[in-house]
């Protein structure tokens, strides 16, 4: 991982701050749609700090600079940040939060500036209150200062064509989705909903794009009222097929006109659906993740209500067509991974081929690309050998990566976008003789993964409540991992999808798991400078039958759809109970049954799969 000298960039930024009377400037990770993964043109935090992880916030004062990120990226950030930066490790008790650190830089009258399009309205309010306690104030700086530093070198905003996502894969027409949304808005007496999250726009209209790497979304907004549906998108993105798909049911408007229209809507919030002058004015809804800019355009708290996005909740519950697509694409994807692992072992062990991490991941993409309905990868493949596996979101760089060591742990976290679903699988392997410590760590992680997979729980249970099931075996040894146990997964959409998840984030305590949720199950363990272990399956929530039904309420469990063998060499059977051994053997039997047919004429892969799926 390369370290970028940020001295000149920071010096220029501070000049711009001084010109605008800004004492501290914030640079969030997100774009104006609050996307986790962003287009290159929106990589402002990476540009100013040199840190390339997907999560974090940069804070720059006139004399100091700090970068806050979570446990997934502590190792990476410590390597990528130069001497200008202080690393704030989020979640570590001895360290201040980035909000607290920002407040510490203030004295009476000092100003904290931020681009209001890159922060949510609720975060802006919370930050403003924190800053006020230190005598400072928060200022929305309309012109992004990092963009000015970046100048002509900043990449252009993508303008890729949008495609129709057919009902045969979506399972529901966009007209039905809009009708359902309107019913929800009417229940809550809303004047309409302004859609700002890119995956929500794509899902609602059954459209897909290519503006953000690995995420089939496109830059857009939408406004849905009881009688209108407006899609804000650049004209050049639209093909004749897309226009025909939308027909006369959707009005197409320029992407940049959203704020002008939002302002007009805010000024006429006494909407047509009021039903009479005696009724209170109806407010427009925006997501709690919508930007401060959008909230201000609509008129702020008097005209706008921030709510849990009804689209996000609906999108997280997959319909039968989407669930069947997830099953099917994971079988094909599992076959691709199996072929890759068999090939990789043969190259490293039998042929003694010298391969680096990128060469290996290139081969995996080549194999995947031949699968039915393949569109592209769902994220940048993590192909990591030895100590690199301890970097949770490691990114092997083509000109600066490691040779794969057959005598070390190899961790591969990868996924693909298929027309019928999105995949995300992690497997940790060893092509030589693993140490006792590596086998123990792997087995403890595996026990945690099985505990989630086999969990049965009453309806209303959250992923927050389930998280300890995955960690319990590591905890008994005084071990842990600094990332979530699971995240929601889209259906040919973002591989990280809210609002569900398994972990300690507050949002995971607010959303009960429901039938139709698709989520990852991925505990891990990492030793910096030595090795990393992670095992990940995708699971789907379903209703299960129990002997009793306390409280006369439904009980839920999971169905796993990932079909890729575990690494038998890393499993220590002495640490497993009979139920866990039974689960592993039944899982491997299922993997063999569902994927071996792909290798009828591929003796190498078939033999590898047969060996890896033998009973333990």
From Swiss-Prot:
E.C. code: 3.4.11.9
Highest taxon, organism lineage: Eukaryota
Keywords: Aminopeptidase, Hydrolase, Manganese, Metal-binding, Metalloprotease, Protease
UniProt binding sites for Mn(2+) 1: 424, 522, 536
Gene Ontology molecular function: metal ion binding; metalloaminopeptidase activity
SUPFAM superfamilies: Creatinase/aminopeptidase (SSF55920), Creatinase/prolidase N-terminal domain (SSF53092)
Listed cofactors: Mn(2+)
GO biological process per UniProt: proteolysis
Enzyme class: hydrolase
Reaction(s) this enzyme catalyzes, per UniProt: Release of any N-terminal amino acid, including proline, that is linked to proline, even from a dipeptide or tripeptide
Entry's cofactor comment: Binds 2 manganese ions per subunit.
Gene3D superfamilies reported for this sequence: Creatinase/methionine aminopeptidase superfamily, Creatinase/prolidase N-terminal domain
Protein family per UniProt: Belongs to the peptidase M24B family.
Name of this chain's protein: Probable Xaa-Pro aminopeptidase P
Phylogenetic classification of the source organism: Eukaryota, Fungi, Dikarya, Ascomycota, Pezizomycotina
Protein's gene: AMPP
